Amino acid sequence: SANANVAGQRLNVTTNASNGFTVTVQADQTLTSSNNDTIDVFDDGDGAAAPKAWEQPTGTFGSVNTYGHWGLTSDDDINGSEFGSALFVGNFSTSSRAVFHHSGPANGSTDNIGSTTVAYAAAVTAFQEAGDDYTATLTYVATPVF
């Protein structure tokens, strides 16, 4: 199916750091099966750094990077709301990507100050290599700014 599946995580940060914090995320790999098949990063494996609207994988036979992809979005107002209304990036598996930031103390519950949602979308085409064990480990790091 070429329809995206979406899963989200709620991030909560409580800090008394006067200049706030930044939360980054990094995947240890792209989604990889036990057969070493992969679901590449958004968009068609190009690792989009600039947020853009979700696009389905193109599914070009013989071009494995186009068989499926996954990307991330954040509802935080980070960098002037760079993720806008569900814009996605794919550059979070080879380096860390900032997904949440606030410039002052945070209470762990107020939207865009102490709490936000990060979501991951994944879609595959009929050419994606079969497997039910595609995995990647996401590591979040919250860094205070003093």
Language-model regions, residue ranges each:
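Signature of Gram-negative chaperone-usher
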Residues: S1-F146
